Amino acid sequence: MSNYEALLKFNRKAVSKEMVQYLASTTASIIKIKKTNSMIDIALPAPPLTKFINRLIKHSNVQTPTLMATSVYLAKLRSIIPSNVYGIETTRHRIFLGCLILAAKTLNDSSPLNKHWAEYTDGLLILREVNTIERELLEYFDWDVTISTDDLITCLSPFLKPIKEEQLYKSQRDCRTLKNFSAQEKDIVNKTSISHSRSSSNMSIPSLASTSTLSTLESRRSNLSNYSNRIRTLPELHESNNISDKFSPRTYNIDSKHDNKENRPIPTIKPFNFSKARPVILKTGLNKQIIKEDTKVKKSNWSNYFKS
């Protein structure tokens, strides 16, 4: 952030206690005060400078740009007034009021009149004294009341430096946040790709069926087949063969002497003779019930009623 951008951001801020304290300390550094034992100073003591500045801000409703431009005039006046000069108790109040009036009239198209500024002092200064203060300051400045951007940056550097540091910290934090966010996105993408590859590998059978798994399955199948063969007895085999001979045209020649499976002969299948097969005639439709009607006329009891 440049100094000009920091200055623009500073001008948008509201008036704070730090600003008032800075203006009061700058005004106090211009001239020294020599205490007097006059009856006027004892009867009507001047308010503290910070309280006086706060009162002017409240009555005039001055904003930060105009208020802080007063520091440029205060800095110029500090370089003009000799260091061996002493003022009275209200000298600092007069200096600040004169610089504020010049800043308000220079930077604004419409500003309070001097009679209004005299009222804002709550009786500390009268209108004639306010007019005198303004003319004396114009003579000190040789009627040159221009305020440049460089002057503002120089005088307000204590306020601009924290703004620049804060902006730098925010930019670095945003950069770190962006890097962390991009790193998290990469991690998420990597995790999703890994999970996708795992799911796709799980769907493929060869990757899941290893050699050990296949051998285990084959051994289990062979054990089950041997166990079932042991349970099955010879009479059951003969019964099953007899049943198959009755209901199927195939006949198996099983030699009981051959107990081993390897020496058993291969069963022979007799060819089926299709010439001896009788054709099957399928009837279409349903059998109709034949209703026998009795055509003979039966005598009924009604004939008795018609006889004469």
From Swiss-Prot:
Induction: By transcription factors SBF (SWI4-SWI6 cell-cycle box binding factor) and SWI5 in a cell cycle-regulated manner. Peaks in G1 phase. Residues 18-146 form the Cyclin N-terminal domain. It is found in: Cytoplasm; Nucleus. Keywords: Cell cycle, Cell division, Cyclin, Cytoplasm, Nucleus. Residues 255-264 have a biased composition (Basic and acidic residues). One of its GO terms (biological process) is septin ring organization. Residues 248-270 are annotated as: Disordered. GO terms for cellular component: cellular bud neck; cellular bud tip; cyclin-dependent protein kinase holoenzyme complex; cytoplasm; incipient cellular bud site; nucleus. One of its GO terms (molecular function) is cyclin-dependent protein serine/threonine kinase regulator activity. It comes from the Eukaryota. It holds the Pfam family Cyclin_N. InterPro entries: Cyclin-like_dom, Cyclin-like_sf, Cyclin_N, Cyclin_PHO80-like, PHO85_cyclin_1/2/9. G1/S-specific cyclin partner of the cyclin-dependent kinase (CDK) PHO85. Essential for the control of the cell cycle at the G1/S (start) transition. Together with cyclin PCL1, positively controls degradation of sphingoid long chain base kinase LCB4. The PCL2-PHO85 cyclin-CDK holoenzyme phosphorylates LCB4, which is required for its ubiquitination and degradation. PCL2-PHO85 also phosphorylates RVS167, linking cyclin-CDK activity with organization of the actin cytoskeleton. Forms a cyclin-CDK complex with PHO85. Interacts with RVS167. Belongs to the cyclin family. PCL1,2 subfamily. This is PHO85 cyclin-2. The gene is PCL2.
